[in-house]
């Protein structure tokens, strides 16, 4: 009799746990794709961050020590706290992936990327890889392995190079041949990047027009101009008009520069007819709540229709990666 009672109780618990699990997995959010997530070990001592911290850049003098605390402000009403450990970061990010029905395009430390992937449903993290110090053969092997789906983040601007520099051309040729899209950093790098942080950096090398020779050599290469070439909107629009496979992500600028200017930049892209080629992204690094902050910029943009918001938050990126929308989780009735 005791055995039967134990068996019945065990079956009851099994059904209860199954019901709870199904309830937890119930989808309530429309899918979102974040095109720009950096993955690395947590840096000890990282402080909190105020969104749109570059809204009032400090005056500075070369005879005075430059204090980054004056730029990376944390004196606002609700600063974003930094993750304090790799485990905390993993839990914060994978929890958001599930809760907010997100897919992240992530690049950086492959070991950490794999550990995140193990915690979320299949396909919810899309790994990217930059050529970095890889030979062309090593880069090809990495892409042909099937693990990496994106060539990113390619950032020659920080090395004082144009994206059309011929030293990079064999890597882009491999991506074009294999049908792998590429993400290229173009635009600003932050306050004092050249004279304080990186003497090789040149603002002029973020000009979207510098992509023209690359695109002419590789007409079937699909690219994402990361950070949307901010603040060079006129050249960005002209490049997109001349090249049908150029998309942009609005990462980085979306949480750092003055919010009014960010909205105006996005508005210009939409007004010029490129609403189908703008993709949401955070340029995520250290602060988990940056995801909600960045997403809110699009969700609360009154100049965007609901269809335009869905294009930016999901549809355009799904098309960019040639994804089947039926493979995503959707709320009931959607």
Describe the function of each predicted region.
Residues 37-39, 106-109, 129-131, 152-156, ...:
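A cross-domain feature marking catalytic cores of carbohydrate-active enzymes
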Residues 6-16:
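Bacterial N-terminal signal peptides
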Residues 21-25, 109-193, 200-202:
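Active-site gating/metal-coordination segments in enzymes
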Residues 40-42, 111-114, 134-135, 159, ...:
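Active-site environment of divalent metal-dependent phosphoester hydrolases
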Residues 50-87, 92-111, 125-130, 149-153:
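Divalent metal-dependent hydrolysis catalytic cores, especially in the metallo-beta-lactamase
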Residues 3, 19-78, 91, 274-277, ...:
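Mid-to-C-terminal alpha-helical segments outside catalytic/metal-binding sites
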Residues 45-58, 119-125, 198-203:
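Aromatic- and acidic-residue-enriched segments that line the glycan-binding/catalytic groove
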Residues 149-150, 164-279, 331-333:
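Catalytic pocket-lining loop regions of alpha/beta-barrel enzymes
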